[in-house]
Swiss-Prot record:
Organism: Trichophyton verrucosum (strain HKI 0517)
Cofactor(s) needed for function: Zn(2+)
Gene3D superfamilies assigned: Zn peptidases
Protein's cellular compartments: Secreted
Name of protein: Probable zinc metalloprotease TRV_03476
Cleavable signal peptide: 1-24
Assigned protein family: Belongs to the peptidase M28 family. M28B subfamily.
Amino acid sequence: MRFLISSLLSGLALLTSLHAFVLALPREYTIAMSNPFHESLFSCPAASWPRVKLGSENTPQEPSKDLRKILSQISPKRIEATIRKLVSFGTRHTLSTQTNATYGIGAARDWIESEFQRYANASDGRLTVKVVGYDQQPDGNRIPFPVRISDVVATLKGEGDPERVYVVSGHYDSRNSDPLDYKGIAPGANDDASGVAVSLELARVMSQRDLPRPKATIVFAAVAGEEQGLYGANFLAQSFRNSSTNVEGMFTNDIIGSSTADDGTKEPHVIRLFAQGIPPLNVENQAMRERRIMIGGDNDTPARQLARFVKETAENKHTDMEVSVIYRLDRYLRGGDHRPFLEAGYPAARFTEPNENYAHQHQDIRIDKDPKTGKDIQYGDLPEFCDFDFISRVGKVNAAALWNLAMSPGMPRNVRVNTNALSNDSKFSWDPPAGGNALVGGYEIVWRSTTAPFWTHKMDVGMVQEATIDLSKDNVIFGIRARGKNGERGVAVLPFP
């Protein structure tokens, strides 16, 4: 009994001491002790390491007065009218007739050209339009006979650095359940009249004579042959490559027509942006790829730097959209027109709606049973399933990204980090953008932790071409970007040793 009483007294004393210890702890620790899953048990003050007092927070870039004017004029009604007009051609299958004035892909091509030309006529010579193409021979797959592939291209030439080019496109061809059925109805409202509508609407708004010309050139394209094998986009990308055109960014808008999934889930203020990681081997050879992996640069490819730029400049109250950057080339089992541009060595990314309804893609028009519920549902890519306000907001995201890109000085070249000796600081050097320093107001070093998706810090280093920062290159990811004379940021570039 004496032993038991002694043990109880000792235990009570221990509990009293423990209670006093707990009371002395900071509040966040006492909360954690009462909750074994509290976040403070999985984090600590060192989680923000390396702690740096250099530079400043990298905040989003607000749209300029001119850009706000552009965004305010993007019209859901015009986008709807464009989509319904394209659907009215019955089918826009790449293999369909090109001689009928009201039916088939030829009629759609001619109408798109006429719309671009109408905007060009009102632009005081700023916008020019042409149809380019080639004869595609049978490929043993989805091209069973020779066919003309035509791309409709409208060019808003820049003033200041016109040799630097940005491209936005949608594909105007369509298909139904059978990829070789070129006679049956294939409305293609979402896939991809929605993307073509954005190209047309941006060309209309951005080419207006009461706006300043962009510094760089913007190309608005409607391409064919996507459903048969990305043929139109490949032709356009290779044409740019063959002429040594400096394309510093390309966006394809493909399936951007609806914010509603097959289960009714709605995300009307989110757009996905797909950005590839390691470039194709024909763009970066094996040695370059190994260097990229060695320095941890696999998440800092040109495509992903472009996506970061979009996130930073096009996600705001004026677009009313969140840009959800997806770090992969595309969705599973799918492909898009950004891929040929990537394979040509150009930074490119794909915009696609957040939720897809596969009953409204690549389907014959019919009422049939839903395999999940057994209920009758409407199949087919019809305008009634499009959200035209949503498409206009996606158009605003594109406009914000393109205008900011075209008004920026472009990307610095030959960006390097010095690794000649061991050191705890980081020394960088770079060359001006391809257009020189005429548009540059200064340069910035940006950085983030190796696990962060987007830039968190920046430091203005002025009009120099080399700089040293008291922060170890071993601990963060760095980028170098040019800043325009009015503060317009360019796309950051990863420094290589």
